[in-house]
Amino acid sequence: MTALSAQACWLVEPGRAELRSETLPKPTADQVQVRTLHSGISRGTETLVFRGEVPASEVERMRAPFQSGDFPGPVKYGYSSVGIVEAGPAALLGRSVFCLFPHQTRYVVPAVAVHVLPDGVPLARAVLAANLETAVNALWDAAPRLGDRISVVGGGTVGLLVAWLAGRMPGCVVEVVDTHVARREVTERLGVNFAVPEAARDEADLVIHASGCTEGLATALRLAAFEAIVLELSWYGKLAVNVPLGGAFHSRRLLLKSSQVGQVATAQRSRWSRRRRIELSLSLLTDPALDALITDAAPFAALPAVLARLAGSTSDLTLCHRIDYT
């Protein structure tokens, strides 16, 4: 097979991305060549990377599986790619697959790095898989119980996926807390409740914080009941965070716990591989209600401008921004 060229999105330096051409290697017997149809922007992490806010202490731990280059740049970053296998083992030829690959028109990876989409999962929706994997891991860390009152502070893509999953547990009452009233519509489509911070229900058995801002963390601590868990799912990068541990934090014996998808949650780690976890996440994407989380789409050629817009705005209500390839 003649080697092909591909285009990839590179962060040249903080605040500036561009499309670059590169030549693909010929796939070996245990590799596949994938033609990309869609990719998803993981807004929280990718905009933080775009702004050059990865702390020096985290540059190795925050590497994406198929990242090229290094932080702060030039770096090729991303981890939510969906496409069609056009070369490789016969069992995979023509199959629709998900891969933790950056934004690129075509790529060659080991065959074990792609995951065949389950029946009933559209390619366009599969870009949510990486964020849903984060949500799955968060709930493993949080360990909600039947009948729990659960508050999710921060109605971004990950927070809403956490709420959607938790809302499927029998007896659990889930409320998404966000400063943007416009989030009410999407929460209702996902079958969970909504409140602005000042009207949020307190005495929550479990609070999951995913807003990425210190005010949201303060709200999360305020809503927690006696001896409740507050799970911190936000990643702040270089941002210094003011954690309000005064007031009733100690008298209520609250547990503030972190969760990060880079490791399988402790309770599951001895039995679950990362591959099993992502395949579970893909299998959960059959619900059409999740399409409400993909609020925007743009062609691949527009990706550098899209990243700049998302990274430069805190008021933009975009959830998952899908990139489409032709």
Predicted regions mapped to residue ranges:
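A short acidic, Gly/Pro-enriched loop at the edge of an enzyme's catalytic core
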Residues: 200-207
